[in-house]
Amino acid sequence: ISPFVDYITINISSPNTEGLRDLQKKGNIESLLETITKCNKKKLPTFIKISPDIDDNDLKNICKICIKENSISGLVISNTTISRESLYSKQIRNSWKIDEKGGLSGPPVKNLSNMIIEKVFKLTQGKILIIGVGGISTGKDAYEKISLGCNLVQIYTSLIYRGPGVVSNILSELSFLIKKNGYSNVTQLVGKKVKNV
C-alpha cells in the first residue's frame, strides 16, 4: 500500500470486533509492534488507534512504548466509545437505543477523546504525534483538541451529517481562532491548554 498512502493506522480499538481491544494490553501490544516493525520495510509512518475507554495502566504502557519505539509515529485518539454516559443527560426520543451495542462516535465521544489526548500529551511530554478524532464539527472543536495536544485532526461523523463543506467551515473558524488568540500558526497552539508538562 505504500505508493498510495501517506501513513497507516493500526486499529486495535474497535469495540465492534470481539477481543480486538485486548491488543492494547501489556504483552499483546509489544508483540504486535514487533510484528509491525518487521513488516514495515518501507518505513511508512505508522499510528496506533486507541480506545477512549482504555485503562490508565494500558495507556501509560502504550505511551512508554511509543516514546521508546522508533517504529511508531504516534497515536490516533480515539476510536468510538462503548460508554453511554454522555447519553443519559440528553433527552433521547428512543431511549431503548441507549442499550444498543456498538461504538458511539461524534459528540458522544468528544469529551472522552479530549481527556485521553490531554493524558497522552502529558505522559509523553508532547514527544509523539497525536491525531485527534471524535466530536469535531466546528473550528472551535478542532482548536480545543489541538490545544490539548494533538497535531492533526480527523473528522468522520460531521462529514456525514454536514457534507464536504464542513471541512472549509472548520478550517475557516480554526484559522480565525488561531489569529484571534495571538498565534501565528497552528503548531504554536499544540498542547497550550495542558498544565504541568
Task: Indicate residue ranges for each PLM-predicted region.
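Glycine-rich phosphate-binding active-site loops on the catalytic face of alpha/beta enzymes
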Residues: 12, 73-82, 135-136, 142-169
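Extended, intrinsically disordered, low-complexity segments
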Residues: 110, 172-197
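Glycine/Thr-rich beta-alpha phosphate-binding loop at enzyme active sites
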Residues: 12-25, 63, 67-68, 72-126
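Generic structural signal for well-ordered alpha-helices
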Residues: 2, 26-37, 59-64, 117, ...
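Short beta-strand/loop segments at the ligand-binding rim of alpha/beta enzyme cores
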Residues: 39-51, 120-132
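Internal alpha/beta core interface subdomains
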Residues: 1-16
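C-terminal helical cap(s) of enzyme catalytic domains, especially alpha/beta-barrels
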Residues: 84-102, 146, 159-183
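Catalytic cores of alpha/beta
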Residues: 54-69, 121-126, 136-153
